[in-house]
């Protein structure tokens, strides 16, 4: 029986209070003075504390939260509890030697850094380190100038938001899904491409991308405006309270913003027409008051405009003091936010709302986090930069373009100076000639083979006015090889003869379609040697070229007129069509420079004489073997053409 009574008693003691008794239980617990005491709780040091020699350790009672799980706690008890909690915190802070503000900041920073779990070298690091890992180039569309570089994650998110999120309601204010944002963060933090090739946005929403952009900017090691320039960026508006009052009382917006949703209230004065004797005097006084108000308004507007222009001028000078990486990212971000502010009638995110969201990442200071006045001034500065970015950005873009041109010019000078010291280029001797220059302008010029063992010389444009002493050219400045090959060369002659241009390098004659074209006109770009048959076919084709369309004329008759062809030695030459402005009736001969012989000028003179007299001459001697081969080939071609002409003549006679 005693055992049964003990069991029943233990059961009664373990019964928990019902839900209805919970509020009364908490009232009794809080009103109990022992529950609020800060007395120490003795805890034995080891399990063998039952011995007499055991020394207990002291632990402080943890403070309870001001709002327990029951919402029926009286306000009086909550106030008394909050006072006691503050006293306990003050005692603890006095013992530790740190202020509550510093402890809260440390706890907040630790929580933010550990909450997102940043890994890698993109998120949660300095801007310079993030750019060294993954960066994208920004190009200004209006001027096609490379403005600078920004992080890949900012470039990708900005491009996606511009295309899909301009009219999304609550953009940047509504948070995205945590899992999806973390997945995007992992993509842009993973090597080797760090999200450069990522384009699979279908599984993510606009708010996910906006949250990723905010997360990157908020977790930079330092705000975009560095702490050393924090006060300097706030001074232009702090020293002009007229601008601050205007921004607090009026909604500042871009002049091109669509304001279809904005409510405009116009003050309307009700005029009472009473038949009194003093109606005329009242109307005069009202007119004077209206005129005075209008003058005040105009005067205030002029002063406000003057202050705004002066502030913009100061900000232009301040942006120059920023580093290139910070300046480029800040300008890109201001331009992005101004686009969303212009669409505020759809996305409900005006410049004021956007400034409140992005102010911590653009302009903030750790000592002013808990100060509402300082926070408001920083927010107004960011709002001013967003709304008047259309005034700031053109000037900054001009500065960036000027700096880029200066940098390129200095690099070119250094490169040219190094090349002058290391690789001087000799100019070959060139003699004057009466024939106009022939210029080849193939769209796809053949590649130069440096391993070719044949003797070739570079063809340079020849002018009709060349000094007699060729030594002057050699003593002049050395030419520099161009970095990129031009699609065609230009004539530098003094005569107003435009260069002939070959329209296409895929022309085929309708008379000899099986013949191989010379190397300079072939699609493969081979620099093969010209045979007499190929040269004759080219000459026949170019004599039948339409001077207006520069296309080969079609031959309808089966007869071939008797032609006199000039044998051409082995050489590299430039081909061209007929020039409509040229005074020559026939195609001018190409100027050929050969490096195998020293008498290149004599060869040019001989070729020009043979062309002017229209007489057939023998080929210029190069070597004995080459001359024998060409003579045998020419005899075969002459017999072949004679048979062809005899057949066509007999057919016509028949």
From Swiss-Prot:
Residues 1-101, 249-298, 407-504, 516-597, 609-654 are annotated as: Disordered. Keywords: Cytoplasm, Cytoskeleton, GTPase activation, Phosphoprotein. Residues 407-426, 629-640 have a biased composition (Basic and acidic residues). Its main location: cytoplasm. One of its GO terms (molecular function) is GTPase activator activity. Pfam families: RhoGAP (PF00620). The record marks 173 as: Arginine finger. It comes from the Eukaryota. CDD domains: RhoGAP_fSAC7_BAG7. Residues 535-545 have a biased composition (Acidic residues). The keyword Flavoprotein does not apply. It is found in: Cytoplasm, Cytoskeleton. Coiled coil: none annotated. Residues 480-489 have a biased composition (Basic residues). PANTHER family: F-BAR DOMAIN-CONTAINING PROTEIN, SPERMATHECAL PHYSIOLOGY VARIANT. This is GTPase-activating protein SAC7. The lineage of its organism: Eukaryota, Fungi, Dikarya, Ascomycota, Saccharomycotina.
């Amino acid at each position: 029986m005693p055992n049964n009574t003990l069991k029943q008693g233990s059961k009664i003691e373990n019964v928990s209070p019902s839900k209805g008794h919970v509020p009364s239980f908490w009232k009794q617990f809080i009103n109990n003075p022992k529950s609020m005491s800060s007395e120490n709780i003795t805890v034995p040091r080891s399990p063998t504390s039952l011995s007499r020699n055991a020394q207990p350790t002291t632990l402080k009672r943890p403070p309870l939260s001001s709002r327990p799980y029951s919402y029926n706690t009286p306000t009086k008890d909550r106030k008394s509890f909050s006072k006691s909690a503050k006293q306990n915190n003050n005692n603890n802070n006095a013992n530790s030697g740190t202020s509550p503000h510093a402890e809260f900041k440390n706890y907040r920073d630790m929580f933010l850094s550990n909450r997102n779990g940043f890994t890698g070298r993109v998120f949660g690091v300095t801007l310079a380190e993030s750019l060294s890992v993954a960066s994208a180039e920004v190009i200004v569309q209006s001027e096609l100038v490379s403005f600078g570089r920004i992080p890949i994650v900012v470039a990708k998110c900005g491009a996606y938001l511009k295309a899909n999120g301009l009219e999304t309601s609550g953009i940047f204010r509504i948070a995205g899904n945590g899992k999806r944002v973390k997945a995007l963060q992992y993509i842009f933090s993973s090597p080797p491409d760090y999200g450069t090739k990522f384009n699979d946005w279908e599984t993510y929403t606009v708010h996910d991308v906006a949250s990723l952009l905010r997360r990157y900017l908020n977790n930079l090691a330092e705000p975009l405006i560095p702490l050393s320039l924090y006060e300097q960026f706030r001074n232009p508006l702090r020293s002009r309270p007229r601008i601050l009052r205007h921004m607090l009382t009026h909604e500042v917006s871009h002049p091109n913003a669509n304001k279809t949703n904005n409510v405009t209230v116009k003050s309307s004065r009700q005029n009472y027409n009473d038949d009194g004797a003093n109606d005329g005097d009242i109307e005069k006084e009202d007119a004077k008051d209206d005129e005075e108000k209008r003058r005040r308004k105009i005067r205030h507007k002029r002063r406000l405009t003057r202050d705004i222009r002066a502030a913009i001028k100061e900000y232009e000078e301040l942006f120059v003091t920023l580093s290139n990486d910070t300046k480029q990212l800040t300008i890109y971000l201001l331009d992005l936010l101004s686009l969303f502010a212009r669409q505020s009638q759809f996305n409900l995110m005006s410049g004021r709302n956007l400034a409140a969201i992005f102010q911590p990442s653009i302009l903030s200071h750790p000592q002013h986090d808990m100060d509402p006045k300082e926070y408001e001034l920083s927010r107004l500065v960011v709002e001013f930069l967003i709304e008047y970015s259309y005034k700031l950005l053109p000037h900054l873009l001009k500065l960036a373009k000027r700096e880029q041109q200066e940098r390129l010019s200095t690099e070119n000078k250094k490169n040219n100076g190094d090349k002058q010291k290391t690789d001087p280029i000799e100019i070959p001797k060139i003699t004057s000639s009466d024939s106009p220059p022939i210029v080849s302008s193939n769209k796809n010029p053949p590649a130069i083979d440096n391993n070719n063992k044949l003797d070739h010389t570079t063809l340079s444009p020849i002018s009709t006015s060349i000094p007699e002493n060729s030594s002057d050219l050699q003593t002049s400045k050395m030419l520099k090889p161009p970095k990129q090959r031009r699609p065609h060369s230009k004539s530098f002659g003094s005569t107003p003869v435009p260069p002939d241009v070959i329209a296409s390098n895929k022309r085929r004659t309708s008379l000899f379609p099986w013949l191989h074209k010379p190397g300079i006109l072939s699609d493969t770009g081979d620099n093969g040697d010209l045979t007499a048959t190929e040269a004759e076919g080219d000459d026949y084709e170019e004599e039948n070229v339409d001077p207006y369309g520069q296309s080969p004329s079609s031959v309808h008759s089966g007869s071939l007129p008797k032609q006199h062809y000039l044998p051409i030695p082995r050489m590299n030459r430039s081909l061209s069509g007929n020039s409509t402005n040229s005074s020559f009736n026939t195609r001018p001969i190409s100027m050929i420079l050969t490096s195998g012989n020293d008498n290149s000028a004599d060869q040019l003179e001989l070729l020009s004489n043979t062309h002017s007299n229209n007489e057939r001459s023998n080929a210029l001697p190069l070597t004995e073997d080459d001359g024998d081969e060409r003579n045998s080939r020419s005899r075969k071609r002459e017999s072949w053409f004679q048979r062809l002409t005899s057949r066509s003549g007999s057919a016509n006679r028949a």
